[in-house]
Amino acid sequence: MSSETGLGTRLRATSGMGDGIEGAQMLGQHQPALPQPQATVMNNPDPPEITRPNQPKRQTNQLQYLLKAVLKTLWKHQFAWPFQLPVDVVKLNLPDYHKIIKTPMDMGTIKKRLENHYYWNAQECIQDFNTMFTNCYIYNKPGDDIVLMAEALEKLFLQKISEMPQEETELTVVQSKGRGRGRKEQDASITPMRTRVLSGSLEDKSTVKPPVTPVSKPSTPTPPTVTRAPTPPQTRPQQGRPPAIAQAPIRFSPTISQDVVVPTTVAPTLVPPPLSNHPAVIHTAAQPAKTKKGVKRKADTTTPTTHDPLHESSPLPSDPKPPRAVPRKENGRQIRPTKKTEVPDSQLPAPPVLHPQPAPNAERDTKTSEQLRYCASIIREMFSKKHQAYAWPFYKPVDVEALGLHDYCEIIKHPMDLGTIKVKMENRDYKEAQEFASDVRLMFSNCYKYNPPDHEVVIMARKLQDVFEMRFAKMPDEPEEAPAPVPSLAPGPPAPSIKGPPPTSSDSSSDSTSDSESSSDSEEERAQRLAELQEQLKAVHEQLAALSQPQPNKPKKKEREKRKEKHKRKEEVEEPRKGRIREPPAKKPKKSVQGSGGTPSIKKEAPPPAPRPARPAPPSAPCESSEEETQRCRPMSYEEKRQLSLDINKLPGEKLGRVVHIIQSREPSLKNSNPDEIEIDFETLKPSTLRELERYVTSCLRKKRKSQDKIEAPTSGTVKVKGYSSSESESSSESSTSDSEESDSETAPNQKKKGHSGRESRKHHHPMQQPLAAQLPVMKPPSPTIAPSYPLPSSLDSSHISLHHPLHPANVFDAVMQLPPDLPPHLTGQTEHCSPPHLNQHALTSPPALHNAMPQQPSRPSNRAAALPTKPAMPPSASPPPPAPQPPQQPHVHHHHHHHAQPPHVLLEDDEPPSPLTGLPPYLQPLQKSQQPPTQSPIHSLLTSVKVQSQTPMAAPPQSMRHLQPLVYPPPPSTATTAPPPASSHIHQLQSSPVVPQQLPAGQAPPPPQQQQQHPALQGTLVSSHQQHVQHQHAKQQQVIQHHHHHPSPRQQKQETYPGGHLRDAPSPLLLHSPPVPPYPGLTHPPSPQSVQPKKQEIRGASVLQPQPVVMKEDKRHSPSIRPEGFSPGMRPEPQKVPEVLKGPSHIQPRPDLKKMDGGRPIRLPDQSLPPQGMPEKEKQKQEPKTPVAPKKDIKIKNMGSWAGLMQKPPVTPTSAGKSTSDSFELFRRQAREKEERERALKLQAEQAERVRREQDRMSRTREDDEVQDQARKAHEEARRRQEQQQQQQHVQSNLPTAPSPAQSSQPMMDQREMARKREQERRRRQAMAPSIDMNFQSELMEIFEQNLFS
């Protein structure tokens, strides 16, 4: 670091800032400054020169970059403060500094030199920077704080230098110097003599008392009126460092315009030579303060002062006041209070803004006040709880008495604390921010000086100083940054810095300043203007980003209403003026356009909707030009915005892209936002944008209504519900994917209010895959029409109401009301599910149950499962409990489950194109279609055939039989049953219907749904075995139906043998109350008969199915004319027919475990459900757990009677086709059983072989162990014998006492014997344990058992 000091031999005990003090004192090297400058022997040398009067001024692009980019950045750095002033060796007590450092340098000097065009090229300036850093490294120790700060600054400096322009080009030199931007160059030529005289006189005075007269650039030649400032200058120390001193105490009367006070006694010869280059004139209002950052006012370095800045609060002698207090008045300028001193420009420390254009004095005042306000905020922050943990020791002055610090006052000459600083700030004793910073740094320096470095107070001080320096470095540097950024790019404050009126006191000087500026500062002005515009643009972007942020807390309803009214009034007033461009009012509802799956969806946080019956219809057609313009800009009411949000939520995903485009094209603030996710506040959108959105949404919804009307026209039938074709439904469902998720919960209340008007219901049905609802007459029969007498089963609850119309459950009742009265309401729910398989392939997710015992749910604008792709089916074991709500099904179902009561030929016409069985005869297609849908299509087809008989007399009997076919002959299903099966309550309702006069006995009430879920894996097998029994039953009872069904017997058999697909979707009794089990992925296209699970489970299913003692009694009484039970197709075995069915398979014929129950019904007892002969005990155990499922079979079997009665309605035409079909089924079942038997036999053989192999291995291992042990034993015995022989020989040979030697020889024998004994014990233990525990065998056995149990 360098030292720039006062003039001549004057002692400079006053350093402008505490920067240098602190920088050195933090190192612990410094002693307290001497308060009396005369007492010190040290003196500061002359400061480095900052001007070259004999050399022409030169400006280059690199020098300009160094000033405006490099130096400005370094000056604002938090570690820059020790380097902003020359090292004051007097204040810091560094007597050897100038012996070690021969070329002092500091950033203040470099800054002045750059402003005065001192350097000829950039290399000279860079050399000065390097000198400054090198001085710091030479004088200070490597680990010192000041060295670390210098390294940080140097790193930043080198980084900035690397960005400097490579080629240096000369620029035109701006004649007006940094201080006198408003002055012409000739002013400088007029004033030098007076300047010298003044500075000389001041120097003369300064030897007696510390004058506070700064030296500045030449000022305008005005008569030297000597006027003392009304306020005392005591607290204003003057120093020669540019950024150093706060010149607060010297206040100049703002009413005086003259700028120079020259005592007549001053001899000009006293001025040192540098003064000619930098004349020390008391600066008046004629010289504007530079609008620079950091330090507010730049003090003249040429005028020495003996006043210690640490004593700023102490009064100074008032004698020096007259020479420097030059009151002035600026024409036309508002007079500020005296506390905001109009200090001559030369007294101001160099501000950190590095461009030479100064701002007017008015701006200087503004800037000063802004920075002081910022300083006050720093003080407040340091007093806050946030920093209280380490700032509390500095809140109050050091209490020397209480703490016993008797030497404190001797070491610390100028105590300081935050409390004192705060008081001074409140009393406005600080005139510039640098004074405040000096006091704060003095406080820290005192702490570092008095306390040892490892003291906890020092650690706390360092923490607090870090906070202070960080905040202080961020202090606003220019007034133009203070005002909030506005879109207009010409804010008031920046203008003066670009091309402001000259701050001179006279109009002529003002004119000359503006002329010189306009001629010379073009380059700098352009650069500065560009920087300012960029900053403003950045601020505008930040403001827009803040505005576009979602409102953290939604305002209360009353406030929203008030704001709405205020907004309306304001818009009415502003409408004629603003036209289309209108500023939106405060935020109210939020709408976020958010992409789901790449397609933007719009989410609206709608406030509680105001009650209103329906939204006002949007403008139907544009008016004439002016009227249209007015309409386009007409502000939207709150209700219209809310309705628009609801309508946007109804749009399909592909339309939302256009919505985003409209918003982005009309709202500049959102132009660059991500289209996949846009957060929009409706209140921030212009009325024209909202109107355009309204027109677009209305047109989209109108098109959708028209397309729905067209599609409805061709459909016919008793229920006026249109059925979409597959392609239409696919597209419409896909189009409405993204908006369903978000709007479901939020818009439910809104639609609930509107759900009772036909127009509103259409509105809501449109966007959400409910085109059918537009054609449904919304007759609202009360829910009790179904609820009291026919409790809706879970399947009807979930899939019928929610599938038909998730928005309005009442629409289901509309369809019910249109059905003939002879059908109970649950059948209408069933008919809704009669849809071709291609429509139901996606209906895999369970909709929320809308049980009709519950109140009607609010209408919902979307189906949460709308856009989901087809999901693979889940195994039945994962099925949820029946009462659980089922999520709405896929949108395709919404469009297509509308063939309710149409004649079967109408169904064929609608569904033929996508039907997978186009090759089948037309009369078979309804059958196959009824097999495929995962919803209760068989029941529906039966009902439609019965219902439509009068309408289609010729085709009715065959069609009804064909529809019954899936009920009579479903193939053995796998465990995965597809659609939501009809609950048994459906069947009970059939019994209570006019067609079924007889009710179920109480003993046959369906078991609770939980029972049906206990063994979900058995459901398919149970269904299959019952279906087989039913085949025989219907072969005898309903031959006409079977004749029609089995007429195309080869093809029919082929179709029926499919275990997958939807044949087994005929309501299985086991699943009547169970939740819908999603189909396996391949079930929509049935696999071959040999597919997976059915084969394994048929035998078990049949055997488990049969132990039903209680329920089967009832079945024997059923005759073709009696329908005592709901018919569960394919599940009710007729008691008389089962023996025939069971005779087929060779391994089933013996059946010793079957017994007749009340009428010859073969029932397998629970304890007799054994596998065929040859099965090991494990296989038998595997099937025993399945016997408790018997109650489930009861449900299935008991549902058959009513269906049997319904099937008998067509004329009976006895044929033998039914029997042949049943035989073919029996053959298939027999083959499946045989195959399963073979598989089990093979598995048993493999297990037996594995068991034998393991036993052999075990035996071989034991044999090997025995052999090893025997060999060891033999070897041991041989060794022992040899030893005994040797011992005997030794005994014989010598009569001497050889006791020790036999003992020694016998010892190894004893060890060997002990070892052999242990081995034998281990062998026997293993032998004993071997038959009892074989862990490998046990684990394998458990695996086999588990496989057999769950397979």
From Swiss-Prot:
Localisation: Nucleus; Chromosome
Location of the Bromo domain: 58-164, 366-475
Keywords assigned: Bromodomain, Chromatin regulator, Chromosome, Nucleus, Repeat, Transcription, Transcription regulation
GO molecular function: lysine-acetylated histone binding; p53 binding; transcription cis-regulatory region binding
Pfam families registered for this protein in UniProt: BET, BRD4_CDT, Bromodomain
Gene3D superfamilies given in the database record: 1.20.1270.220, Bromodomain-like (1.20.920.10)
Renumbered residue ranges of the record's region BID region: 543-598
GO biological-process terms attached to the record: chromatin remodeling; positive regulation of canonical NF-kappaB signal transduction; positive regulation of T-helper 17 cell lineage commitment; positive regulation of transcription by RNA polymerase II; positive regulation of transcription elongation by RNA polymerase II; regulation of DNA-templated transcription; regulation of inflammatory response
Site (Acetylated histone binding): N140, N451
Start and end residues of each stretch annotated as Disordered: 1-23, 35-58, 168-244, 285-368, 478-638, 700-799, 821-1334
Main localization (coarse): nucleus
InterPro entries: BRD4_CDT (IPR031354), Bromo_Brdt_I (IPR043508), Bromo_Brdt_II (IPR043509), Bromo_chromatin_reader (IPR050935), Bromodomain (IPR001487), Bromodomain-like_sf (IPR036427), Bromodomain_CS (IPR018359), NET_dom (IPR027353)
Keyword Transcription: yes
Family membership: Belongs to the BET family.
Domain notes: The 2 bromo domains mediate specific binding to acetylated histones. The exact combination of modified histone tails required to recruit brd4 to target genes is still unclear. The first bromo domain has high affinity for acetylated histone H4 tail, whereas the second bromo domain recognizes multiply acetylated marks in histone H3.
Name of the featured protein: Bromodomain-containing protein 4A
Taxonomic source organism: Xenopus laevis (African clawed frog)
